[in-house]
Amino acid sequence: MLLRTMAATSPRPPPSTSLTSQQPPSPPSQLPLRTMPGSYGWPLVGPLSDRLDYFWFQGPDKFFRTRAEKYKSTVFRTNIPPTFPFFGNVNPNIVAVLDVKSFSHLFDMDLVDKRDVLIGDFRPSLGFYGGVCVGVNLDTTEPKHAKIKGFAMETLKRSSKVWLQELRSNLNIFWGTIESEISKNGAASYIFPLQRCIFSFLCASLAGVDASVSPDIAENGWKTINTWLALQVIPTAKLGVVPQPLEEILLHTWPYPSLLIAGNYKKLYNFIDENAGDCLRLGQEEFRLTRDEAIQNLLFVLGFNAYGGFSVFLPSLIGRITGDNSGLQERIRTEVRRVCGSGSDLNFKTVNEMELVKSVVYETLRFNPPVPLQFARARKDFQISSHDAVFEVKKGELLCGYQPLVMRDANVFDEPEEFKPDRYVGETGSELLNYLYWSNGPQTGTPSASNKQCAAKDIVTLTASLLVADLFLRYDTITGDSGSIKAVVKAK
């Protein structure tokens, strides 16, 4: 539950003011050059004050929104946690970019370096990955990046043969658990059963291993990943699990050592080492990785990227659908059954024909980005454009985009504060995919060794669409929220 709490949806901000295009940013000469507003404040005092605002007095959403209003700009300088007193090697200074146009610069690899900036200037100990620098921490200019990205993409390609079968098999178990809990208790909390389902599904599809070959891993592997993830991101995340000032004192004051999870992580490592031979040989023989590098990167893709991402995104999607009372369920059900006819007709091809289902998935990713913050470091001096001005960025400065605000850019998205299920339907709706950046790049982009876009960009949206379609082949209606399901009516 800690993982879910850390990624809880931010309050809805008011729309920012900007416009962008998936094409390279407009020539800076077309816009006025402006001195970048904002301040880092006095040494120690400024970063500490911003940290307390971010975590305590304001929260991330209000933190960025009030500064954008104060400076009358969607681009400005400020600080972001973690910082003083026990993060002496972390520079909290950032350039915030809060509109679609300025945010798009984060994906121009000629302008930015993505080395060691997954969660900002703070990097969790390499001990969490057995001392290996995994692919996410590499820039595209580093030779090993192409090998690791290629390994990830080929693993995903090969997994497509069993992806649908394993997904539906594990969903059968998941929904069986939910139905049983509802019949016994009148409602079912589904976060943990869903995480167990996700873990088992990913082990089988990505690593080619049935988690049940190890009863300990089948029972506890997903719990280990929850702890492993939490220890890495706690210093950067507002949790709300304990009252302030205890959260600041106990949770945001220091980095957590990998030793706290080393024993259980080693069990996961050994599980992959002993059972995922085909996948590991792919990494060793085709991409020239050592066996240790292949294991550590496979675990990162499985645990951090896939499991962590789905654990945040899918509850948002399920909660959005189960909590809707506008007639959306009836519309989705009608589309799914019209396209599929029967459950046996559900596949990648048929789900791609479900425009409304896909649009709901995309709109959930816009409304609740699973990764709220994205970072990149200026590779050189350059000019960054917002909707109404140009600013000078110096080499080495850290750019930070806060997606819950970026994805509510009123100059790009009509009525950005509203969840519109049909937003991406039709030709006009498809154009908006150019500005959907949840995957570290646009939804219309192509992941490759030359960029940092999520290798699973397309399979994530397909998987979510398959889950929704599967749901409405099973049930006529379903009632609940982002944490529990209260009732289901089976399909007639």
Swiss-Prot record:
Recorded name of the encoding gene: CYP74B2
Domain of life: Eukaryota
GO cellular component, one term: chloroplast
GO molecular function, one term: iron ion binding
Organism taxonomic ancestry: Eukaryota, Viridiplantae, Streptophyta, Embryophyta, Tracheophyta
Family annotation (CDD domains): CYP74 (cd11071)
Function: Catalyzes the conversion of (9Z,11E,15Z)-(13S)-hydroperoxyoctadeca-9,11,15-trienoate to (9Z)-12-oxo-dodec-9-enoate and cis-3-hexenal. Possesses low activity toward (9Z,11E)-(13S)-13-hydroperoxyoctadeca-9,11-dienoate. Required for the synthesis of the green leaf volatiles (GLVs) hexanal and trans-2-hexenal.
SUPFAM superfamilies, sorted: Cytochrome P450 (SSF48264)
Knockout consequences: No visible phenotype under normal growth conditions, but plants lacking HPL1 cannot synthesize the green leaf volatiles (GLVs) hexanal and trans-2-hexenal.
Name of this chain's protein: Linolenate hydroperoxide lyase, chloroplastic
Principal subcellular localization: plastid
Record: residues binding heme: C454
InterPro entries in UniProt: Cyt_P450, Cyt_P450_E_grp-IV, Cyt_P450_sf
Keyword Lyase: yes
